[in-house]
């Protein structure tokens, strides 16, 4: 069993001296890959039950579970390790196993016993109360206990920064994060700290690193997170890359796109909230989003709205609409509209917002006045302590909801997903 690893992670793979291991860093640094490898190596040697946690259970399948599945195959362990997809579980011939749970289904955590190892992936997305609950689930009569937490850095208002580094309001200091960025690996009390960036992943292509560098030009906050791997103070604007341009210029740009993807989304309203419909176009190669048409009205009954939007019944353009209103969708369908409900799930509000933020530019026609009014200054809501709430805003942006729905099944290339940071023997190393 031979596996290439990145040198910056060699020490981490076999160091189990501390109870907590906190890995923070930029995109493509191979954090998750090496955590998964570390756990597999541990469970091959010792009979343990490991619990892998994400905030939303369903996100495991294409992330952590997929990663373990690939590792087992790459390491040629299929004869002693079995990956079961329903329910997701990894079983070892020595009795070890890895189980996967989500904090969105807390009741399923209550039946778990004898957990000696927990990995919280994307721990910044888990609530602090959830973290403390997991500490209570980490118990075993004989084996040493370990918790691994991995994340990209977010704002300094996130609990991960306050718990593992410093909380100025509570006058609590654990470690200076700037010292970690300089030294890269630090052991403090019972916590092993590890910092990494894309530069530590020798298996990444230069083109990927260049994409991260380009973030500096259009999203400084994301550059700090993705390229530098640093915590910091997030700007309050949700879409700093949003810009307004003359309608003719927008339409010309769309006409020049190589195979543009065009979509329509609708958010329902009535009295105080608005019916918002947007037409958007995506330049997949440039990662540009164009918004070139809008409808924005309230106080109308469904029949009046259908009459005003009758062009869609004629063109049969597919409209992705708010699935929370199945009766309204059915009404429009009965009146000739090609309308379906968009995918919504627990946590989708945050995930859809993150998706839209991944566009390099969001270019809006100056004719879409309500979209501009809502999105250009759109800011995050804050709690009573002034901390940003990532899935809440200072207003209810109906046009943003319409964009979410329009693009529900389209994925902006995520710089984190473009390279999973998983060393492959067949891939040439980056020099």
From Swiss-Prot:
What keywords appear on the UniProt entry? Viral genome packaging, Viral release from host cell
Please verify whether the record's keywords include Acetylation: no
- Subunit and interaction comment: Dimer of a small and a large subunit.
Annotated NCBIfam families = phage_term_2
What PANTHER family does the record tag this protein with? Answer: PBSX PHAGE TERMINASE LARGE SUBUNIT (PTHR39184:SF1), PTHR39184
Query: What does the record give as the function of this protein?
Result: May function as a terminase.
The family note in this entry says: To B.subtilis XtmB and phage SPP1 terminase large subunit.
Q: What is this protein's record name?
A: Uncharacterized protein YqaT
From which source organism is this entry? Answer: Bacillus subtilis (strain 168)
What's the source species' lineage? Bacteria, Bacillati, Bacillota, Bacilli, Bacillales
């Amino acid at each position: 069993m031979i596996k290439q690893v990145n040198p910056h992670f060699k020490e981490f793979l076999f160091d189990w001296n501390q109870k907590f291991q906190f890995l923070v860093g930029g995109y493509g640094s191979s954090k998750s890959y090496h955590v998964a490898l570390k756990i597999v190596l541990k469970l091959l040697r010792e009979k343990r039950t490991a619990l892998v946690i994400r905030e939303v259970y369903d996100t495991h399948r294409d992330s952590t579970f997929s990663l373990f599945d690939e590792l087992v195959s790459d390491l040629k362990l299929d004869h002693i390790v079995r990956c079961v997809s329903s329910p997701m579980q990894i079983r070892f011939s020595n009795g070890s196993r890895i189980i996967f749970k989500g904090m969105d289904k807390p009741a399923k955590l209550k039946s778990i016993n004898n957990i000696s190892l927990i990995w919280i992936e994307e721990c910044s997305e888990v609530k602090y109360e959830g973290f403390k609950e997991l500490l209570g689930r980490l118990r075993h009569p004989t084996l040493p206990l370990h918790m691994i937490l991995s994340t990209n850095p977010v704002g300094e208002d996130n609990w991960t920064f306050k718990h593992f580094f410093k909380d100025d309001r509570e006058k609590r200091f654990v470690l200076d994060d700037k010292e970690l960025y300089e030294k890269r690996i630090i052991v403090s009390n019972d916590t092993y700290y590890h910092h990494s960036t894309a530069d530590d992943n020798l298996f990444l292509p230069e083109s990927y690193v260049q994409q991260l560098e380009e973030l500096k030009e259009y999203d400084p906050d994301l550059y700090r997170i993705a390229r530098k791997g640093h915590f910091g103070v997030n700007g309050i604007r949700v879409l700093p890359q949003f810009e307004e341009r003359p309608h003719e210029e927008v339409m010309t740009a769309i006409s020049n796109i190589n195979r543009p993807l065009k979509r329509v989304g609708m958010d329902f309203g009535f009295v105080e909230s608005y019916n918002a419909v947007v037409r958007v176009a995506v330049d997949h190669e440039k990662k540009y989003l164009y918004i070139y048409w809008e409808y924005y009205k309230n106080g109308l009954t469904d029949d009046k709205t259908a009459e005003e939007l009758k062009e869609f019944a004629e063109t049969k353009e597919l409209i992705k609409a708010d699935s929370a209103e199945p009766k309204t969708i059915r009404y429009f369908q009965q009146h000739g509209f090609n309308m379906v409900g968009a995918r919504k799930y627990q946590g989708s509000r945050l995930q859809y917002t993150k998706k839209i933020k991944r566009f390099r530019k969001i270019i809006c026609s100056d004719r879409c006045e309500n979209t501009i009014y809502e999105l250009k200054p759109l800011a995050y809501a804050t709690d009573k302590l002034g901390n940003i709430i990532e899935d809440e805003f200072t207003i209810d942006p109906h046009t943003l909801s319409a964009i979410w729905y329009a693009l529900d099944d389209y994925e902006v290339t995520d710089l984190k997903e473009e390279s999973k940071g998983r060393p492959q023997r067949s891939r040439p190393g980056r020099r």
